[in-house]
């Protein structure tokens, strides 16, 4: 299903978490575990986008009390290779009032639909390769299942991802993270709901509860259709909670031109 069918099934996105540790370090904080993937916090959803191209602009922030806000602008281009496979290349920068903007990672994301309406629950496989462009170098891979279902006019998403770093991304334990979304189709041009993200630590030995990350908050989505194949899609969320046990606020925004 194409992103242009948002009145029937909507779209959103994400990735996951090494940038959080860098954000805390930039803010002058120490952090125990290093998360591997330089993230963008957008809930991953997968649709039949065959033949559609996607120009992608993303922007997200982390703000801790009495610390400078750290920002991550991102730019990408995606393509629906087939009815089941969507691929995207994008770059992520990082900066703050105390650190000049610099290229952080280059990323290649692939999402493959395993079911297309045969079951009450849609299932897909997400995989992302991350190449660190900062001094430490190295790379990371993130992968895991993407789950989606509908209850009336409300779409429910739940994803669990693992990521593992190599080289400068610290070849340590494989880490586990989660993301979820509730999206209600109120009007064809306006959907609202909530999103949540978290990092649990090593997949087989979670961090203590007070060292984990859990954030959630309200989200809004809108679509401006130009014709049957072209549209602007915009989503934004404001998240409250913690980053590895420290209080933090996050803002995420994503604007796409689908054509």
Predicted regions and their residues:
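Residue-level detector of alpha-helical transmembrane segments in integral membrane proteins
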Residues: 11, 26-27, 211
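Bacterial N-terminal signal peptides
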Residues: 19-30
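N-terminal secretory signal peptides that target proteins for export/translocation
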Residues: 1-15
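Short hydrophobic/aromatic segments of transmembrane alpha-helices and their interfaces
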Residues: 18-20, 68-69
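Enrichment for repetitive, rod-forming helical segments
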Residues: 15-16, 25, 65
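Transmembrane beta-barrel domains of Gram-negative outer membranes and organellar outer membranes
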Residues: 36-259
């Amino acid at each position: 299903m194409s992103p242009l069918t948002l009145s029937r099934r909507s779209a959103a996105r994400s990735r996951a978490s090494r940038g959080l540790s860098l954000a805390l370090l930039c803010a002058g904080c120490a952090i125990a575990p290093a998360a591997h993937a330089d993230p963008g916090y957008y809930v991953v959803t997968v649709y039949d986008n065959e033949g559609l191209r996607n120009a992608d602009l993303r922007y997200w922030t982390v703000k801790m009390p009495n610390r400078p806000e750290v920002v991550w602008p991102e730019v990408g281009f995606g393509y629906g290779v087939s009815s089941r496979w969507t691929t995207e290349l994008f770059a992520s920068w990082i900066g703050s009032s105390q650190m000049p903007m610099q290229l952080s990672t280059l990323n290649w994301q692939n999402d493959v639909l395993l079911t297309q309406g045969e079951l009450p629950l849609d299932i897909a496989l997400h995989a992302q390769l991350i190449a660190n462009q900062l001094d430490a170098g190295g790379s990371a891979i993130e992968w895991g299942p993407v789950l989606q279902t509908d209850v009336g006019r409300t779409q429910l998403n739940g994803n669990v991802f693992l990521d593992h770093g190599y080289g400068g991304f610290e070849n340590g334990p494989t880490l586990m993270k989660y993301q979820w979304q509730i999206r209600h189709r109120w009007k064809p041009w306006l959907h609202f709901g909530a999103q949540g993200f978290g990092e649990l630590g090593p997949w087989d030995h979670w961090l203590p509860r007070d060292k984990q990350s859990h954030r959630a908050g309200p989200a809004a989505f809108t679509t401006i259709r130009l014709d049957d194949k072209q549209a602007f899609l915009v989503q934004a969320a404001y998240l409250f909670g913690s980053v590895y046990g420290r209080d933090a606020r996050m803002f995420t925004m994503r604007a796409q031109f689908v054509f």
